[in-house]
């Protein structure tokens, strides 16, 4: 609640900024006291509470909040952003900068979204549109054929293009899927491929 009283929004439709980051503070607390793995398991465990009933952002100008998913889905969105940094310290510093930038301010989701795009030096609007303005959770689809892998995003907005960390036979690899098929080839036949569970996405291996 400290976070929400420090930074909040001027429209209840954007209350995910207040509630999502406040929810994620529980993950930060768990990580600090019990370790990174425990923090990851905690935030992943909250996904079972996500309903995907309505978009997180409500209708503007009519005093309407979005879905209650602003808490747990919002927290998982923040955790996903952390993964895109691929550097825990840089993410921590960005969080501190956010608290400086918007200190004791009433702001908007759009301003916060722009802030995180600036911090990552990447247009995150496809990410925010997907998780805040849609009820769909993207699915990473994979097709394996020997030493070749085809991959794409499905069940998502047409412009969704967020990178994801996967493990190919236990080795870390970053993919940059879009909604059209892409492909990569390794020297040897691929046995297993799976996404990092810290990304709140679905996963399907197609035949």
Locate the predicted segments by residue.
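Hydrophobic alpha-helical and helix-loop surface patches within well-folded domains
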Residues: 1-156, 171
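Compositionally biased, low-hydrophobicity segments enriched in charged and small polar residues
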Residues: 94-102, 177, 184, 204
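Beta-strand-rich binding/interaction modules
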Residues: 124-125, 140, 144-198
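Short acidic/polar inter-strand loop motif in beta-rich domains
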Residues: 197-207
């Amino acid at each position: 609640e400290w976070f929400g009283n420090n930074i909040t929004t001027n429209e209840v439709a954007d209350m995910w900024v207040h509630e999502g980051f406040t929810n994620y503070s529980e993950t930060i607390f768990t990580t600090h006291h019990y370790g990174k793995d425990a923090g990851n398991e905690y935030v992943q465990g909250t996904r079972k509470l996500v309903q995907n009933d309505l978009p997180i952002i409500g209708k503007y100008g009519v005093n309407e909040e979005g879905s209650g998913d602003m808490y747990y889905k919002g927290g998982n969105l923040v955790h996903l952003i952390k993964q895109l940094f691929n550097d825990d310290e840089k993410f921590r510093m960005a969080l501190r900068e956010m608290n400086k930038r918007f200190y004791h301010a009433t702001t908007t989701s759009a301003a916060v979204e722009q802030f995180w795009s600036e911090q990552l030096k990447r247009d995150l609007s496809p990410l925010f549109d997907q998780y805040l303005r849609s009820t769909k959770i993207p699915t990473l689809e994979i097709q394996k054929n020997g030493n070749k892998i085809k991959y794409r995003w499905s069940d998502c907005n047409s412009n969704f293009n967020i990178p994801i960390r996967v493990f190919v036979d236990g080795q870390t690899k970053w993919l940059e899927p879009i909604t059209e098929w892409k492909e990569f080839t390794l020297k040897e036949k691929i046995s297993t491929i799976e996404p990092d569970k810290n990304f709140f996405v679905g996963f399907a291996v197609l035949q």
